[in-house]
Amino acid sequence: MSSLVSHRARAATASLLLASVALSGCSILGGARNSADISKLPNIPEGQKQQLVSQMQSASGSEKQEIAAKATALSKMVGTELVAVDPPSIIDQTFKLDPKGKTVVNKDDKIYLMMSATDYWRLGQDTYDLCVEQDCEYYSSWTVDVEGSGADLTYVWTLKVDGDDQPKEPLVRRFKVGK
């Protein structure tokens, strides 16, 4: 009989603990849950972060979850090995933004050239700037968007090069999270 009471007491305690976590608004999984959380996330360009906060403030229930997931994915991209899935010439090659401002890429792979042949990076106003040198005197500014979620999460890097002699369409690279 005492074992049954003990089991019920443990079950009740566990239920109360889960309920208190849920009511406190904490996320067991981490990440952004509201616009204040988004504004605190690192590794997102300030202009893009402000857009996400603005979108969050005017969004409804499920839209808020999508915006929070996008912001969290962008923040977590730094330090994560990305595996190219498009264009075909760089499929399965890896690229990473190191948290200390360096790019991690095999310079013998084509992806090195296709990602501006850079060794450093920084956050721009609305972009991730890939830099030739640490002082970023010469750099290319890439916007990064997120498509899908979970195992289907894709980071879409886009570079628009201005000039009459440049392609009309932007350069696009797609990445999945490495295993």
Region annotations inferred by a language model:
Residues L23-G25:
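C-terminal motif of bacterial Sec signal peptides marking the signal peptidase cleavage site
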Residues S27-G30:
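Bacterial signal peptide processing site
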Residues N34-M56:
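Immediate post-signal-peptide N-terminus of mature secreted/exported proteins
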Residues Q50, S54-D92, D119, L123, ...:
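Tryptophan-anchored aromatic micro-motifs
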Residues D86-D129, D135, Y155-W157:
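N-terminal glycine/threonine-rich, aromatic-flanked beta-hairpin/loop signature
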Residues D126-G148:
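An anionic, turn-rich surface loop/hairpin at beta-sheet edges
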